[in-house]
Protein backbone atom coordinates (compact mmCIF):
# COMPACT_ATOMS: atom_id res chain seq x y z
CA UNK A 1 0.00 0.00 0.00
CA UNK A 2 1.13 3.57 -0.65
CA UNK A 3 0.84 6.18 2.07
CA UNK A 4 2.18 9.52 0.95
CA UNK A 5 5.46 8.61 -0.70
CA UNK A 6 5.89 5.54 1.50
CA UNK A 7 4.84 1.96 1.05
CA UNK A 8 2.76 0.58 3.88
CA UNK A 9 2.46 -3.15 4.51
CA UNK A 10 -0.83 -4.91 5.12
CA UNK A 11 -1.65 -4.90 8.81
CA UNK A 12 -3.94 -7.24 10.71
CA UNK A 13 -5.47 -6.24 14.03
CA UNK A 14 -7.02 -8.82 16.33
CA UNK A 15 -8.90 -6.29 18.44
CA UNK A 16 -11.09 -3.30 17.64
CA UNK A 17 -9.56 -0.35 15.84
CA UNK A 18 -10.89 3.05 16.86
CA UNK A 19 -10.61 6.19 14.80
CA UNK A 20 -11.69 9.41 16.49
CA UNK A 21 -11.76 11.19 13.15
CA UNK A 22 -12.98 8.47 10.73
CA UNK A 23 -11.47 6.55 7.86
CA UNK A 24 -11.57 7.93 4.36
CA UNK A 25 -11.11 5.55 1.46
CA UNK A 26 -10.24 7.43 -1.71
CA UNK A 27 -8.19 7.04 -4.83
CA UNK A 28 -8.33 5.29 -8.18
CA UNK A 29 -8.43 1.83 -6.59
CA UNK A 30 -11.76 2.51 -4.87
CA UNK A 31 -13.79 1.93 -8.05
CA UNK A 32 -13.47 -1.09 -10.29
CA UNK A 33 -15.12 -1.36 -13.70
CA UNK A 34 -16.50 -4.85 -14.32
CA UNK A 35 -16.51 -5.23 -18.12
CA UNK A 36 -16.83 -9.03 -18.40
CA UNK A 37 -18.08 -11.99 -16.37
CA UNK A 38 -16.10 -11.83 -13.11
CA UNK A 39 -15.45 -14.11 -10.14
CA UNK A 40 -15.20 -11.54 -7.34
CA UNK A 41 -12.67 -11.81 -4.51
CA UNK A 42 -12.52 -10.18 -1.10
CA UNK A 43 -9.02 -8.83 -1.72
CA UNK A 44 -9.77 -7.21 -5.07
CA UNK A 45 -13.45 -6.23 -4.82
CA UNK A 46 -14.81 -6.00 -1.24
CA UNK A 47 -15.30 -2.48 0.10
CA UNK A 48 -14.96 -0.91 -3.34
CA UNK A 49 -17.58 0.50 -5.70
CA UNK A 50 -18.06 -2.05 -8.48
CA UNK A 51 -19.17 -0.34 -11.69
CA UNK A 52 -21.09 -2.87 -13.77
CA UNK A 53 -20.25 -2.20 -17.42
CA UNK A 54 -21.35 -5.47 -19.03
CA UNK A 55 -25.07 -5.51 -19.89
CA UNK A 56 -25.25 -9.30 -19.65
CA UNK A 57 -22.44 -9.77 -17.13
CA UNK A 58 -22.37 -12.54 -14.53
CA UNK A 59 -20.71 -11.31 -11.31
CA UNK A 60 -20.10 -14.19 -8.90
CA UNK A 61 -19.58 -13.47 -5.20
CA UNK A 62 -16.90 -15.44 -3.33
CA UNK A 63 -17.89 -18.45 -1.24
CA UNK A 64 -18.49 -17.37 2.36
CA UNK A 65 -15.85 -18.67 4.77
CA UNK A 66 -16.85 -18.52 8.44
CA UNK A 67 -13.84 -20.39 9.83
CA UNK A 68 -10.67 -20.64 7.83
CA UNK A 69 -8.07 -21.24 10.49
CA UNK A 70 -5.00 -23.11 9.32
CA UNK A 71 -3.51 -25.95 11.33
CA UNK A 72 -0.82 -23.62 12.70
CA UNK A 73 -2.67 -20.33 13.21
CA UNK A 74 -5.95 -19.00 14.59
CA UNK A 75 -8.49 -16.23 14.17
CA UNK A 76 -5.90 -13.44 14.21
CA UNK A 77 -3.64 -14.96 11.55
CA UNK A 78 -3.02 -12.59 8.66
CA UNK A 79 -3.71 -15.40 6.18
CA UNK A 80 -7.06 -16.40 7.73
CA UNK A 81 -9.59 -16.39 4.88
CA UNK A 82 -12.69 -15.77 7.02
CA UNK A 83 -14.70 -13.23 5.02
CA UNK A 84 -17.68 -12.48 7.28
CA UNK A 85 -18.44 -8.76 6.95
CA UNK A 86 -17.08 -8.45 3.41
CA UNK A 87 -19.32 -6.00 1.54
CA UNK A 88 -19.71 -5.70 -2.23
CA UNK A 89 -21.24 -2.47 -3.60
CA UNK A 90 -22.56 -2.57 -7.17
CA UNK A 91 -23.49 0.46 -9.29
CA UNK A 92 -25.09 -0.15 -12.69
CA UNK A 93 -23.17 2.10 -15.07
CA UNK A 94 -24.20 0.28 -18.27
CA UNK A 95 -27.90 -0.65 -18.41
CA UNK A 96 -28.55 -4.34 -17.86
CA UNK A 97 -30.09 -6.66 -20.44
CA UNK A 98 -29.46 -9.97 -18.61
CA UNK A 99 -27.11 -9.08 -15.75
CA UNK A 100 -26.68 -11.40 -12.76
CA UNK A 101 -25.15 -11.02 -9.31
CA UNK A 102 -24.86 -14.56 -8.06
CA UNK A 103 -23.47 -16.72 -5.30
CA UNK A 104 -21.69 -20.05 -5.56
CA UNK A 105 -25.10 -21.77 -5.37
CA UNK A 106 -24.66 -22.82 -1.73
CA UNK A 107 -24.69 -19.29 -0.29
CA UNK A 108 -28.14 -17.65 -0.38
CA UNK A 109 -29.45 -14.08 -0.35
CA UNK A 110 -31.39 -12.64 2.63
CA UNK A 111 -32.81 -9.12 2.96
CA UNK A 112 -34.71 -6.98 0.47
CA UNK A 113 -34.35 -5.09 -2.80
CA UNK A 114 -36.63 -2.21 -3.73
CA UNK A 115 -37.47 -1.83 -7.42
CA UNK A 116 -38.85 1.50 -8.65
CA UNK A 117 -40.05 2.68 -12.05
CA UNK A 118 -40.46 6.14 -13.53
CA UNK A 119 -44.23 6.36 -12.86
CA UNK A 120 -43.62 6.21 -9.11
CA UNK A 121 -44.56 2.56 -8.67
CA UNK A 122 -42.32 0.50 -6.44
CA UNK A 123 -42.12 -3.05 -5.20
CA UNK A 124 -40.01 -4.75 -2.56
CA UNK A 125 -38.46 -8.11 -3.38
CA UNK A 126 -37.77 -10.55 -0.56
CA UNK A 127 -35.68 -13.48 -1.76
CA UNK A 128 -36.96 -17.01 -1.21
CA UNK A 129 -34.87 -19.36 0.93
CA UNK A 130 -33.32 -20.90 -2.18
CA UNK A 131 -32.50 -17.62 -3.96
CA UNK A 132 -28.89 -17.33 -5.09
CA UNK A 133 -29.19 -15.02 -8.13
CA UNK A 134 -30.18 -11.37 -8.55
CA UNK A 135 -31.15 -10.85 -12.20
CA UNK A 136 -31.57 -7.43 -13.82
CA UNK A 137 -32.94 -6.90 -17.32
CA UNK A 138 -33.12 -3.11 -17.61
CA UNK A 139 -36.91 -3.24 -17.57
CA UNK A 140 -39.29 -5.18 -15.34
CA UNK A 141 -36.49 -6.48 -13.09
CA UNK A 142 -34.56 -3.23 -12.83
CA UNK A 143 -30.99 -2.62 -13.86
CA UNK A 144 -31.18 0.79 -15.49
CA UNK A 145 -28.20 3.10 -15.06
CA UNK A 146 -28.14 4.31 -11.46
CA UNK A 147 -29.36 1.06 -9.90
CA UNK A 148 -27.42 0.02 -6.80
CA UNK A 149 -27.07 -3.30 -4.96
CA UNK A 150 -25.12 -3.92 -1.76
CA UNK A 151 -24.46 -7.40 -0.37
CA UNK A 152 -22.58 -8.37 2.80
CA UNK A 153 -21.46 -11.80 3.98
CA UNK A 154 -23.19 -12.20 7.37
CA UNK A 155 -23.04 -15.89 8.27
CA UNK A 156 -22.40 -19.35 6.93
CA UNK A 157 -24.20 -19.52 3.56
CA UNK A 158 -25.88 -16.08 3.99
CA UNK A 159 -25.37 -12.85 2.06
CA UNK A 160 -27.46 -9.89 3.28
CA UNK A 161 -28.88 -7.72 0.48
CA UNK A 162 -29.34 -4.17 1.79
CA UNK A 163 -29.34 -0.51 0.76
CA UNK A 164 -30.41 -1.65 -2.71
CA UNK A 165 -32.55 0.13 -5.31
CA UNK A 166 -33.14 -1.19 -8.82
CA UNK A 167 -34.46 1.27 -11.40
CA UNK A 168 -36.70 -0.19 -14.09
CA UNK A 169 -39.50 0.35 -16.58
CA UNK A 170 -42.90 -1.23 -17.33
CA UNK A 171 -44.67 -3.50 -14.83
CA UNK A 172 -42.32 -4.58 -12.07
CA UNK A 173 -41.50 -8.28 -11.86
CA UNK A 174 -39.48 -10.09 -9.20
Please give the residue ranges for each predicted region.
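Extracellular disulfide-bonded cysteine-rich modules/repeats
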Residues: 145-153
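Short solvent-exposed loop/turn micro-motifs enriched in small/polar/acidic residues
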Residues: 10, 142-144
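Beta-strand-rich interaction surfaces with strong enrichment in secreted/lumenal proteins
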Residues: 75-77, 136-140
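A conserved acidic, glycine/proline-rich C-terminal tail/linker
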Residues: 128-138
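Short, charged, surface-exposed secondary-structure boundary motifs
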Residues: 122-126
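Exposed extracellular interaction/assembly regions and N-terminal maturation sites
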Residues: 12-121, 156-174
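Short, Lys/Arg-enriched N-terminal segments with co-localized hydrophobic residues
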Residues: 1-7
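Short linear motifs centered on Gly/Pro in flexible linkers and helix caps
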Residues: 3, 33-35, 128
